[in-house]
Amino acid sequence: GISRIKLTGGEPLVRKGVEKLAEMLCQTPGIEQVTLTTNGVFLKEKLPVLQQAGVHSVNISLDTMDREQYQKLTGTDCLLQVMESIYAALEQGMQVKVNCVALKDQNESQWSKIAALAKSYPLDVRFIEMMPIGLGKSCLGSLQETVQKKLEAVYGEAKPEADLSAERGNGPAVYWEFPGFQGKIGFISAISHKFCADCNRIRMTAEGFVKPCLQFAKGVDMRALLRGQNEDIVLKEALKQLIYEKPRCHQFETEDEDESLEQ
């Protein structure tokens, strides 16, 4: 069954009642962990209530540590707030992961600076290959080998994570150890190291539509089923069928692509 839930977006912390939702999920029997992916802008002020709700792990998106470039990429001048949120989360004992999308010809100069956070602090930094869905179709991404080569030129040769039993996360990230780092460097490489065979996720949009894969629009409208006052067995069977029919793999490398739904 489903035992781990991640609240993501968009930006979940701008949604009214997200703290109460997190609390409800944490208190649901069978749910072992609820985590949050955020841009970090409002995280610092919401940390106490999130921790009280039962959220003890956050992923914070950060594609540059240059203030001017951050404003260009996001449209907001909020880099300081994001950095304060990272430090505050660490001080509160939360598990922190920083996510950086590797953008070709855009943030290459920032990769080593963002990676340095894992050297100076007990957090993990993950570099994510750009997936050609939604706005990602118009952006060029860099592959894991390119990022890793640049990081090793600065910090020395990396080695695969020694302790494979370490509880680092629930997803497809593969972690590497760099000399002298407190944290690990992870790579989420959907393009160069296709991990579909090990994918254990389904996704629910803000409208209650459940999808088995980010790329494809196919899914189940759970909100409609709930409003139809169906019995629990109907909902369970709908989810079971959705998971059973989960696509074998994405088709990012082809032009034959269904309409994706990235929310």
Question: Which stretches of residues belong to each language-model region?
Answer:
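Short, intrinsically disordered/low-complexity patches at protein termini
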Residues: 39, 234-235, 259
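Radical SAM/AdoMet-radical enzyme domain recognition
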Residues: 1-7, 11, 15-128
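Short flanking/linker segments adjacent to small metal-binding domains or redox-active Cys/His motifs
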Residues: 4, 242-263
